[in-house]
Structure formats: C-alpha cells, structure tokens
C-alpha cells in the first residue's frame, strides 16, 4: 500500500525541482497553487479536465506576469505540477486546445462541449476555484460574448456553472476575487517598476 504524500513531501519535491529563489511578490502564488494542487491530488471525486487545465494556466500566467528571470517561468509551472502528480504537458495541451476551440465556438458548440464534459466527468463533481477561472477564460475567448454587457456575460457563466453542477454563487465569488487580485497584482508591479526607475 502506497504512503499518502504530505504537503511537506510536495514542498520538498518542489524545491528539489525548482531550487531557485522566488521573488517575494510571486511567492504567495506559488505556495497557494502548490497547496491547492496537493489537496486536489487527494480528492477522489476530482477530475482534471480541460476547464480545470485552462483555469490553472490562466491563473499561473496572469500572476507570473513580469516574472524575472523569464526563463524560470516554465520551470516554476512544471515544478508546481510535478510535485503533486499533475502532468504539466497534459495541462498545457488541454488548455491550449480548449482556448483554440473556444475562439470559434458557437452557442451550439459550447452546449455540445459542456454535454461531453458532463458525461466524461460523471462521478467526479468536486469543485475547485480553478474551475471558475477556467469557465471565465472559456467565455472570454468566445467571439459570441466579446461585445455583450457584463450582466449577459454573468448570465452565461451562471448557465455554464449550472450545467456543470456548480453553485453559481461560488463561481461568481471566485471569479470576482480573481479579478480583484489581478488588479492588485498589476498595481503592485507598477509600484515596483516605478521604484526601480527612481533609484
């Protein structure tokens, strides 16, 4: 019988694969994603699908904006995934495929995709906030919703959430927090850049 890995095990594996200092502004992201993926790796009713993969990539890319040295970004993502048993290549490919498809999705295509996702995920109904970001990214990439009002976009997110068996109130809250944190991160990076210029 295999021994269940602890969060300490995951962190140890992470630092072995990524033996670099993480700039302070990005440290919280790395730690939160590492812990989140560790918890998900032990959830029997969680399944890594394309919406989750898209959400994970979106969160990581948004919150590593401006990361230096830039050549460490891919290594950081790979280490966060690998130390928790997630295959970074599979996640990248799954995310890229969905985002690419979404750019030409019609409403019928979306419904077909959601129906297939539901069928594939039967018995796996665990919700992660990363799924919420995946839904938001999916809708944001669809031409159908590029010019709609925010209330109409929210209605679509509500419909998608319900079709996937998620509570819209949780999805809405997680998306709202995500947007707020992106803005805070952007402001923090602007302040850092300004301070560097004045030195």
From Swiss-Prot:
Residues 167-198 form a coiled coil. Signal peptide: none annotated. Pfam families: ThylakoidFormat (PF11264). Keywords: Coiled coil. It comes from the Bacteria. GO terms for biological process: photosystem II assembly. GO terms for cellular component: plasma membrane-derived thylakoid photosystem II. The keyword Magnesium does not apply. The keyword RNA-binding does not apply. May be involved in photosynthetic membrane biogenesis. NCBIfam families: PS_II_psb29. Belongs to the THF1 family. This is Protein Thf1. It comes from Prochlorococcus marinus (strain NATL1A). The gene is thf1.
